[in-house]
């Protein structure tokens, strides 16, 4: 009884900085990802109930993916790290990177990425009316748009509602760490 009530009372609304942008080389990256997904294997059950969830270190030697991950790391550095008062210079490293293919009925349950500093989602293939990325604490919804990236502190709980359409909704996701 009491523990349940306490957990409801302890919900905190976070005023976290969420970075949303459009990747300059989206057309080239998206074409490459769609091609590579033809050969990807599904890792099975995760908190993402997608028809395909690639491995956690997907396409580590693909130059377009390497460039994209470098871009995301630089966005994190410029949007978050320059605000730190610390005299130490941190490097931002991509810890893992994967793809998700959502088909009708697929979703992602509420989760976070607490073992990491930052996370991101990137829309490879989606319509504006497809399921959004939803941050639970604020109820902020980020509508999909091909080429759009969303970077956020990894502690933010988020989910993706059930995909209701017959076409695929395809995303890339990743987690990043800070190292000295």
Annotate each PLM feature:
Residues 1-9:
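Short, Lys/Arg-enriched N-terminal segments with co-localized hydrophobic residues
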Residues 2, 57-59, 99, 129:
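Short linear interaction motif-like sites in intrinsically disordered regions of transcription factors
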Residues 8-90:
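Non-heme Fe(II)/2-oxoglutarate
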Residues 85, 90-162, 167-171, 175-180:
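Catalytic core of non-heme Fe(II) oxygenases with the double-stranded beta-helix
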């Amino acid at each position: 009884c009491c523990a349940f009530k306490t957990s409801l009372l302890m919900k905190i609304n976070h005023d976290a900085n969420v970075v949303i942008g459009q990747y300059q080389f989206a057309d080239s990256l998206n074409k490459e990802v769609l091609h590579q997904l033809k050969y990807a294997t599904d890792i099975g059950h995760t908190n993402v109930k997608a028809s395909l969830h690639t491995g956690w270190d997907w396409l580590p030697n693909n130059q377009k993916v390497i460039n994209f991950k470098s871009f995301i790391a630089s966005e994190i550095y410029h949007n978050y790290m320059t605000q730190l008062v610390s005299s130490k210079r941190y490097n931002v490293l991509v810890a893992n990177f994967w793809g998700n293919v959502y088909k009708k009925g697929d979703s992602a349950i509420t989760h976070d990425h607490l073992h990491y500093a930052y996370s991101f989602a990137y829309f490879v293939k989606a319509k504006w009316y497809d399921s959004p990325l939803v941050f639970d604490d604020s109820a902020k919804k980020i509508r999909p748009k091909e080429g759009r990236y969303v970077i956020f502190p990894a502690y933010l709980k988020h989910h993706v509602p059930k995909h209701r359409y017959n076409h695929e909704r395809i995303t890339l996701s990743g987690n990043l760490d800070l190292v000295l």
